Regions:
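An acidic, low-aromatic, low-complexity terminal/linker signal
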Residues: 1-165
Length: 165
């Protein structure tokens, strides 16, 4: 029986530099998105929400999860991708960690997956800076989101015409 070959130092260095990350994939209108699990505090199912008047299109509304009021974003709308008209109850809300009290709306959530940093490809030009990259998993393309940048993009301030006296 032949003995296994020794791996070179460069192979060992490459293996050490390739870190593993857990992602929580979710879907909206036949598009797959994901966030790193260390950005997610919890998931909630079947949550009614209240729409906010004059809110940007990517803001679905507010929802109460575990006694906290969260602003819920539609990632697809924030990225100017096809989305859906949300009914009065959100199928899933991904509760994000942090003081911003944000959540992401989802039609469905999938099981957590583990990927290597080497598997992450640069995002497409259309996703701007709200996407960290794209990963292909089980034959599907998943867009990895940067939750903080997604919020900034969703609520971009646009100059409105002001009344002058």
């Amino acid at each position: 029986m032949p003995e296994p070959e020794n791996t070179s130092e460069s192979d060992q260095a490459a293996a050490a530099s390739a870190q593993l990350h857990d992602l929580l994939p979710f879907a909206i209108a036949d598009r797959l998105f994901a966030v790193f699990t260390d950005q997610v505090d919890a998931t909630a199912e079947g949550k009614p929400f209240a729409r906010l008047p004059r809110a940007p299109g990517a803001v679905v509304g507010v929802v109460c999860v575990r006694g906290r009021m969260l602003t819920v974003l539609d990632p697809a709308a924030a990225l100017n991708e096809p989305t859906k008209e949300w009914e009065q109850t959100l199928p899933y809300v991904l509760v994000l960690r942090g003081e911003d009290q944000l959540g992401l709306a989802a039609e469905s959530c999938r099981d957590t997956i583990t990927i290597s940093t080497d598997d992450i490809e640069p995002p497409t030009a259309t996703s701007d800076d709200a996407a960290l990259g794209v990963v292909r998993y089980a034959g599907e393309e998943i867009l990895i989101l940067d939750a903080k940048r997604l919020f900034e993009r969703a609520v971009q301030r646009k100059e409105r015409r002001r009344r002058r006296f």
